[in-house]
Amino acid sequence: MTLPSRRFLLAGAGALAGCSILPKGNPPPQLFRLTVAPPASASGPALKGQLLVDTPFAPSALDTDRIALTRSATSFDYFGGVAWSDRAPLMVQSLLIESLELSGRTPAVARESLALRADWALKTDLLHFEARYGAPGAGAEASPEVRISFSAKLVRMADRIVIGQHMANAVQRASRNEVPAIVDAFDEANHQIIQEIIAWVVATGSSATR
């Protein structure tokens, strides 16, 4: 169903069966999740040692399972009736860890919450994770652009020094102004971001150990 141009609101829930006196409620949201980034070429150096991946820091507007959208630089909203399968930072952390494992270039990777002894820690800030409406010249029903933005830091745990910092940005236009197509655009943009971060982590860590 094409999304309305104004804020997305749930339609009223259907009547309860029979003569129940329970109040009517909204149906649970439809859940969506993103997929693991396909591994790029495994050629080149691998990161030596254990890598811990911290939960990305995110502003409160993004630290939620709601799927975010913007219509201007100063507005923030969410799609109605749908949600991510987990809070966005936790979902991204899980995808980043799985993608690192599948890459073949980071043989030892885990969540930082496990408090394992490690050689490296990856700290990230989730700066943008939203669908953007209102591009110049776009009509009210035009499909949005998905924007994902990360700031990443690689910490050498032996001396707790940040050995590198990287900004990763991806923009992907949805093929249609419908939630499944918008989620597909999130998926593609997230793949680009994760593959870029993996390549940067391996290159930065490998250079620091030479």
Predicted regions and their residues:
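Envelope-exposed proteins and targeting segments
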Residues: 47-49, 63-65, 72, 80, ...
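A structural "domain/chain start" motif
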Residues: 20-90, 204-210
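Surface-exposed short loop/turn segments
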Residues: 22-41, 103-159
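N-terminal export signals
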Residues: 3, 7-21
